[in-house]
């Protein structure tokens, strides 16, 4: 159950980050149309929903797991969001990024083993 809540937290908060980026990309296109056009976009609402669900999953997870064990696992969001940046937004990801991501994963594995 804890692993499922952690995965749900990661996926929802990662989706929320992607939706926030999609929000600002859309807002650039409709900037001249004012706030009404901006708020008609589905992206900010998806961001709010995903981040809200991520918070709910996180709170449920904290009922079952110590924060000192659970919180480092959220670093995996750096990995998820970087992959989304690469494949959704076609942003460059170089060797430096990949090395950093590998270090994050190694740190999460190391901390996960001691938990």
Curated annotation (Swiss-Prot):
<comment type="subunit">
    <text>Heterodimer of ArnE and ArnF.</text>
</comment>
<keyword id="KW-0813">Transport</keyword>
<comment type="similarity">
    <text>Belongs to the ArnE family.</text>
</comment>
<comment type="function">
    <text>Translocates 4-amino-4-deoxy-L-arabinose-phosphoundecaprenol (alpha-L-Ara4N-phosphoundecaprenol) from the cytoplasmic to the periplasmic side of the inner membrane.</text>
</comment>
<keyword id="KW-1133">Transmembrane helix</keyword>
<keyword id="KW-0444">Lipid biosynthesis</keyword>
<dbReference type="Pfam" id="PF00892">
    <property type="entry name" value="EamA"/>
</dbReference>
<dbReference type="GO" id="GO:1901505">
    <property type="term" value="F:carbohydrate derivative transmembrane transporter activity"/>
</dbReference>
<dbReference type="InterPro" id="IPR000390">
    <property type="entry name" value="Small_drug/metabolite_transptr"/>
</dbReference>
<keyword id="KW-1003">Cell membrane</keyword>
<keyword id="KW-0448">Lipopolysaccharide biosynthesis</keyword>
<dbReference type="InterPro" id="IPR000620">
    <property type="entry name" value="EamA_dom"/>
</dbReference>
<keyword id="KW-0472">Membrane</keyword>
<feature type="transmembrane region" description="Helical">
    <location>
        <begin position="65"/>
        <end position="85"/>
    </location>
</feature>
<feature type="transmembrane region" description="Helical">
    <location>
        <begin position="93"/>
        <end position="112"/>
    </location>
</feature>
<keyword id="KW-0997">Cell inner membrane</keyword>
<keyword id="KW-0441">Lipid A biosynthesis</keyword>
<feature type="transmembrane region" description="Helical">
    <location>
        <begin position="42"/>
        <end position="62"/>
    </location>
</feature>
<protein>
    <recommendedName>
        <fullName>Probable 4-amino-4-deoxy-L-arabinose-phosphoundecaprenol flippase subunit ArnE</fullName>
    </recommendedName>
</protein>
<dbReference type="GO" id="GO:0005886">
    <property type="term" value="C:plasma membrane"/>
</dbReference>
<dbReference type="GO" id="GO:0009103">
    <property type="term" value="P:lipopolysaccharide biosynthetic process"/>
</dbReference>
<keyword id="KW-0443">Lipid metabolism</keyword>
<dbReference type="GO" id="GO:0009245">
    <property type="term" value="P:lipid A biosynthetic process"/>
</dbReference>
<feature type="domain" description="EamA">
    <location>
        <begin position="46"/>
        <end position="113"/>
    </location>
</feature>
<keyword id="KW-0812">Transmembrane</keyword>
<comment type="pathway">
    <text>Bacterial outer membrane biogenesis; lipopolysaccharide biosynthesis.</text>
</comment>
<dbReference type="InterPro" id="IPR022883">
    <property type="entry name" value="Flippase_ArnE"/>
</dbReference>
